[in-house]
Amino acid sequence: MNIKNNHLVIMAGGVGSRFWPMSTPDYPKQFIDVLGCGRTLIQLTADRFQGICPPENIWVVTSEKYADTVKEQLPDIADDHILREPCRRNTAPCIAYVSWKIKARNPKANMVVTPSDHIVMNIAEFQRVINSAMNFTADSDAILTLGMKPTRPETGYGYIEADLSVPSTANKEVFRVYSFKEKPDLETARRYIQKNNFFWNAGIFVWNVNTVVNALRVYQPAISKVFERLFPYYYTDKEQEMINQNFPLCENISVDYAIMEKADEIFVLPASFGWSDRGTWGSLHENLPKDAHNNTQIGENIKLYETRNCVIHTTQEKRVVVQGLDGYIVAEKNNTLLICRLSEEQRIKEFSAE
């Protein structure tokens, strides 16, 4: 594998509505220091690919409204590597756009595509897995996805069912995908994890650029025609104008439905590196360190009394004192304070819309 051909694509167009009030449509969670470590989620995402993908091969696909924020937080990325979507069309058009643009400059490119708002605790193992995956796809026609080894019967993730009977001859860590499963109910999730060949779908994909472009041509010809028509305009002054005119013509469809569930050569690399998509306050509470009373605290000036099983998140200098709560979210940002039962956090979207 030639590292000069390795390209990282970060998808950063989401609005993070489940993480309100820290995350808002104007400033979603990928641009926030969720962990209180001094780095935002998108910065941490770029950080963990150091040594795998050269800095000049990093791409971010985002909304036009977030492009300036991306540049502020990742200043070393070239302007023409920040792709501005004029509207939201899910992950298939997003991946198609960046794939055709990369192919225009490097037809030998090997790509890893990742969301911008995930957390990885074991960086060394993550990098080992990514290197293994990219070695597998560099010279093959395979489409590879990472499958997280489940630690609990989770209903918030889709699942990948793998055929573990025979590993790939090219990489003993890689197995064929038998099927993709939608987010299950609790009973089904329990059944999945008992079988040992079901993995969480992390939404991290690895392939070479010719493989993904050819797959899009076969399974999504309408989307492919849009970006093939734009081929002469990539890296020119006309690119954004043509994208603004043509991108909205694409179907709103995820890459899972567009390619992954249709193609034949789909593989999974099962992995375990302390992964979480941190999509909810509950997952934040579950994965971060806790005090003796099972509270997660992020903030400089928090005092807790007779409080258990809570997640407290503040970003300002305000003093926060909590007494007598059990199982609550307490989150404060700007002029908004949220106090909500952890068990009812699915209602946060409802609260944020009011």
Where are these regions (language model features)?
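Conserved N-terminal catalytic core of the sugar/cofactor nucleotidyltransferase
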Residues: 1-10, 18-25, 36-115, 121-131
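Left-handed beta-helix
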Residues: 2-5, 209-354
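Short beta-strand segments
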Residues: 11-12, 61, 112-115, 145-149, ...
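Residue-level signal for inorganic ion chemistry
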Residues: 42, 98, 117, 160, ...
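General beta-strand structural signal in soluble alpha/beta enzymes
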Residues: 60, 83-84, 113, 144-148, ...
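Conserved core of the sugar-phosphate nucleotidyltransferase
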Residues: 123-247, 267, 317, 341-342
